[in-house]
Amino acid sequence: MFDKILIANRGEIACRIIKTARRMGIKTVAVYSDADRDAVHVAMADEAVHIGPAPAAQSYLVIEKIIDACRQTGAQAVHPGYGVLSEREAFPRALAEAGITFIGPNPGAIAAMGDKIESKKAAAAANVSTVPGFLGVIESPEQAVTIADEIGYPVMIKASAGGGGKGMRIAHSADEVAEGFARARSEASSSFGDDRVFVEKFITDPRHIEIQVIGDKHGNVIYLGERECSIQRRNQKVIEEAPSPLLDEATRRKMGEQAVALAKAVSYDSAGTVEFVAGQDKSFYFLEMNTRLQVEHPVTEMITGLDLVELMIRVAAGERLPLAQSDVKLNGWAVESRVYAEDPTRNFLPSIGRLTVYQPPEEGPEGDAIVRNDTGVEEGGEIAIHYDPMIAKLVTWAPTRLAAIESQARALDAFAIDGIRHNIPFLAALMAHPRWREGNLSTGFIAEEFPEGFTAPEPEGEIARRMAAAAAAIDHKLNQRKRGISGQMRDPSLLHFERDRVVLLAGRSYPVTVEARADAILVTEADGTALEVASEWRPGEPVWTGTIGGKVVAIQVRGLLNGVALQHAGAAAEARVFTRREAELAALMPVKEQAGSGKQVLCPMPGLVKSILVSEGAEVKSGEPLAVVEAMKMENVLRAERDATVSKIHAKEGDSLAVDAVILEFA
């Protein structure tokens, strides 16, 4: 076994690997760029080595710097995590030449599966079900259109060396193929240094299901069940779960056996994932094999009780797998939400800045459930433009799928982040969505259910009642505090007074009567329903946690002038609590609407201008591409929101722009 390993990665996955190594008694070495000098993974490791400037191409992606760090610290092995160098065949070869062990698959397996075109040929040879498509390299948009016409629409344009949703486009017409080919090729070149793309049939209404495999250097390979990753946006996974609500045991076994057959065909000897696209009828086709640890591996760990990082380390050290296929048992259900620094109300554009508040939910048992939070940030830390915008992976386990979803919903409500925009409101809304809860999924779920993008819905029904009750409790607590600060003497009898109040929540009035008690308050609604509300919340805390009518509830709280902003179960609203007379007067106050101009196209996030697609004087139609801005390794096409004439262009290709910088103006 190794005495010391180096983690050639950053962020949450580096922290995740360090935790397992520490438990195994193995010392760890972190590497870091200028931007990560104060990062959590650097502080967690036993040693840390600086490897260069912030851009990954000058630090984390430079193989020679990783090898030098190993020599400097005496690290015997390297775990690549995911992304970065994890699937580059040259990396394990260079490590081997330096006498350093790679904690991952052998270079031959990476080469065989890393090329999407060659991997499909290998899968077909191993009798794995494959999607119809053209497995040659496509050289031009015209050739792509010809092939797409032959295959039949819709088609998927994919980077041969791609992954993580980059270099992928769905096209429903020849025009979309031509544009998608250019975008996919550009992203593939910038992300992977390989601009080859291919075209395959896109399965309508598909589900994304993947099989986790693990092999050793003695020819043993097993599968550890499946994960469903159908909730995606721009081909990037958002929510994952294990097992899949679609599969029965027979289909699970069939998919697992095909995954093992493919792994054995390429002598696979580490953790890897075989991805399939599945139809609603349980038919399935091979997509690709990821020759690394997946982002979503925790859900597999939660239902199997296995530590995949530990297994990777042990098989890399030459040990045999400690279990056979018959030993693998799936227990309960796990759900993972990817918490990203992105604004769901602005088409999920990346957000950067300092985490002025970062308070994740408490990890560990929660009744019959378990909460786990894999993260690599802390309060006061910086989310930089140079890297992936992931903040954390929030995982919950419970005996049943619905219980795991309920636990996830509570954990998201209790997850407080401020200083940047984030997608927790969107994730919470997904947890409450009936279609998700029913397991009626497809990779088009988000596009179908949120066609106009995401706006946090106003609270209704039971959610609104809970938020109104919490607002009344918060108002009561704030008034108690004011009385204490003012120095007024409080008669003990004041603990038992009644007060009529009106909670104004999202434009609706909720008349209530608030009765104070020693350890709780009683909120009585207009229909006579009484809810006991108990909480230890203190003014200034970002999350109100307590019980409302006996139900455990967490609600995000932000102070406003004369009120609070509340967020719960994906819904958001401002709440103000009035006396009856104040409510009558407030109803008479005019509300001023803000007008928007729409005459400028602004940069939606800090980024690099990849191209300007129009010229001054050009007449553009609604939906026409205007510019391409790259941020956090993704290209974002900015389109005209209306028919207009371009009067002035302020930016040019290569410009680095701040958020809301003017790119162009309309007449």
PLM features: residue spans?
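Conserved nucleotide-binding/hydrolysis modules and their immediate coupling elements
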Residues: 307, 516-522, 526-543, 547-554, ...
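Long, charged amphipathic helices and adjacent flexible linkers at domain junctions
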Residues: 323-331, 447-450, 454, 489-491, ...
